[in-house]
Amino acid sequence: MRLIATAILGMSVCAFAQFSGRTGRVGGRVTFDDGGQTGGRCLVPGSGGGEEDIRKLDKVDGNGFVYARLRYHLQPWWWQETREVPWHHDYPDGDTMFPASLQRLTTVQATPESFQLVDIDSKELFLYPFLYMSEPGYLNLLPGDLKNLRDYLDRGGFLLMDDFRGNESDNSQFVNMKQQMMKLFPDRELKPLPANHPIFHLFYDVEPHDMLPPYRMFNSGEPQFFGITDAKGNVQVMIDFNNDISEYWQALDVGQCSIHEAGTAVQLGVNYAIYAMTH
């Protein structure tokens, strides 16, 4: 039954991908505030992108779900490991598919355009119930970022950190992410989330550890899920390590992933969004 349900979900998400307005990544060369540069498309993880696909909504509709992708400050060594600016990975294809899945599979009011690109130190954060951060292994939280992000999270906001890989004990990406979270919440512990945690069963019943890592050719470990919680035990920061659910989202309509992994990624995204709006 589980295989049948997964197959049905996979067919559903592939069907709604056709109307979601998927925008292909375009080539180009972009200079960012930190002086880093990124070139055009390249078929390796964390590459490609261009200035043409950076866009802003005319306004934020307060009656529907709109979430924000974070543009954050980077560690100075980021360019040694990836050609694309890390916060940009899977943008905007994954961002389009995420709200499209909410529109198709739930009663949440959303459209494929229900996302925004927001700077981490901007007060615009407080307009959105849900933040998405790509490749947090390269994150560098400055003093202004720390205050803004902590205020946002302590007022009930939710942050999903996704798309980084390696070994938990000696991987620079995981170690750096953990150091940044200790700066953000020195009084709170980053803990593994068990498979029976409510966030995995809120809307869909998901077996989170029954996923293949998206970058197996790079000898990444198995997918792991961590969380930082508030005093009431609510997850404020959700961390998908050795996983990349946005990569699975954007691959839904191009046949580059299995139905099981794509379906599970969609289910996780739906659960995360509903959790963010109800906790």
Q: What kind of region is each of these model predictions?
A:
Residues M1-A7:
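Sec-dependent signal peptide recognition
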Residues L9-A17:
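Hydrophobic h-region of N-terminal signal peptides that target proteins for export
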Residues A17-F130, P136-G137, D244-I245, A251-H279:
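Aromatic-Pro/Gly-enriched surface loop or interdomain linker
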Residues R22-V30, Q37, S47-G49, Q75-W79, ...:
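An acidic, glycine-rich "communication" segment
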Residues N63-F65, F126-F130, R155-F158, R188, ...:
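Loop/turn elements at helix/coil->beta-strand transitions in domains of secreted/extracellular proteins
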Residues Y67, F130-F174:
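Short alpha-beta junction capping motif
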Residues D95-P99, L146, R150, F174-K178, ...:
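Extracytoplasmic/secreted envelope proteins and their assembly/folding machinery
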Residues V108-V118, M161-R165, D187-N196:
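Surface-exposed patches in mature extracellular/periplasmic domains of secreted proteins
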